[in-house]
């Protein structure tokens, strides 16, 4: 990049006060929401998780191509499709050669789907939980899905200027308890910025005593964007563990290191070029016999962050809902969201706390883009 180009880029206003920034987040959110609805429809008895993940990424790419059509537009997948059933808490996205590629969904499976898109580096991720069933869902599966959905709604309304991260942690815990469930221990929600989905400000779920004492307390502020990731389990502890399943989702970090292996340099160069700072699936890179060796060196020296496949320690059912929100001058805007199908989840439990009930009934702004496309500013061309 030339000095002139660098100076021009630093002059661009990427804050929420720039309507174009908000518009890009909204477009990314619409893409993510529309795609995840289609992926939910793919979750039928006999459907293989590998096929669903591949099709999810195809749908993301197809949808992304149709929006923000400018010359050399910077846009793409912000999180590859992950499909995690039952006690698999997160990040299952297998290669065709993996044993899990043959894992097929069956009736009654509780399936979590996570994916996301970005426009010009502004990412909107979304996650939902569905059940492979034609009939309404009852029992523990219904309880955990209802708990996670209600907890997300409460978090969306608690994350606002003046409140702290611990208020969110505590209200999610109270709601999960109302449904006889537990938030998944140690799961994080992050502040987001351009090209950053894991910013410094974090909200932790179900922290240990040491995590609670070590994590900073912070106040939410106007102008911030958050990826709100709520995971709840039917298990009594909510604790998860790393599985033996191969990690297939990674993200490039800001760490620097002189790689020794040619295979490492090759794969790292491809990652930089194709995905930049966003998570990617190794399904989408050139794979040969030395690729795993290259990925291992990159990971061991922290050039790549691995999104490991996590399992509930006690075999509990895990539900997840993820929403991207923006704290604007006019209030909170929900940029991406996904709720369970109406009248599909039949839990016999509910939130009783009158303050939380009132909070859940508080209106919140949901984005609706105008059908007429807006011409991007020159800064985005």
From Swiss-Prot:
Residues that span the membrane, as ranges: none
Keywords from the UniProt entry: DNA-binding, Nucleus, Phosphoprotein
GO cellular component: cytosol; nucleus
Gene3D superfamilies in the record: Creatinase/methionine aminopeptidase superfamily, Winged helix-like DNA-binding domain superfamily/Winged helix DNA-binding domain
GO MF assignments: DNA binding; nuclease activity
Keyword Endoplasmic reticulum assigned: no
Pfam families in UniProt: Peptidase_M24
Function: A non-essential protein that preferentially binds curved DNA. Binds non-curved DNA with a much lower affinity.
Protein name according to UniProt: Curved DNA-binding protein
Annotated source species: Schizosaccharomyces pombe (strain 972 / ATCC 24843) (Fission yeast)
Gene: cdb4
């Amino acid at each position: 990049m030339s000095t002139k180009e660098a100076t021009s880029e630093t002059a661009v206003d990427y804050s929420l006060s720039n309507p174009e920034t908000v518009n890009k987040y909204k477009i990314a959110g619409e893409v993510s929401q529309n795609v995840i609805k289609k992926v939910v429809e793919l979750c039928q008895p006999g459907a293989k998780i590998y096929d669903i993940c591949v099709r999810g990424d195809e749908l993301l790419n197809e949808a992304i191509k149709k929006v923000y059509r400018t010359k050399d537009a910077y846009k793409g997948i912000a999180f590859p499709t992950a499909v995690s059933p039952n006690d698999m808490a997160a990040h299952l996205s297998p290669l065709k050669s993996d044993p899990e590629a043959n894992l097929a969904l069956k009736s009654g499976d509780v399936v979590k789907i996570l994916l996301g898109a970005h426009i010009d580096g502004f990412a909107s991720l979304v996650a939902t939980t569905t059940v492979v069933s034609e009939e309404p869902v009852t029992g523990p599966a219904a309880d955990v899905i209802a708990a996670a959905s209600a907890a997300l709604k409460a978090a969306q309304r608690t994350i606002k200027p003046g409140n702290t991260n611990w208020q969110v942690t505590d209200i999610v815990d109270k709601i999960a308890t109302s449904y006889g469930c537990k938030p998944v221990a140690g799961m994080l929600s992050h502040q987001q910025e351009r090209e950053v989905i894991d910013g410094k400000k974090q909200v932790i779920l179900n922290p240990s005593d040491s995590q609670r004492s070590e994590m900073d307390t912070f106040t939410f502020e106007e102008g911030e964007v958050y990826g709100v990731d709520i995971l709840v389990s039917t298990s009594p502890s909510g604790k998860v563990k790393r599985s033996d399943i191969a990690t297939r989702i990674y993200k490039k970090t800001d760490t620097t290191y002189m790689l020794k292996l040619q295979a490492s340099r090759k794969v790292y160069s491809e990652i930089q070029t194709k995905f930049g700072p966003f998570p990617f699936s190794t399904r989408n890179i050139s794979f040969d016999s030395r690729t795993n060796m290259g990925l291992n060196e990159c990971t061991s020296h922290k050039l790549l962050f691995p999104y490991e496949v996590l399992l509930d320690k006690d075999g509990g059912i895990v539900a997840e809902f993820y929403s991207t929100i923006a704290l604007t001058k006019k209030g909170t805007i929900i940029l991406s969201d996904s709720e369970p199908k109406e009248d599909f989840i039949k839990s016999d439990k509910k939130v009783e706390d009158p303050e939380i009930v009132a909070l859940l009934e508080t209106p919140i702004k949901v984005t609706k883009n105008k059908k007429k496309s807006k011409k991007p500013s020159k800064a985005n061309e």
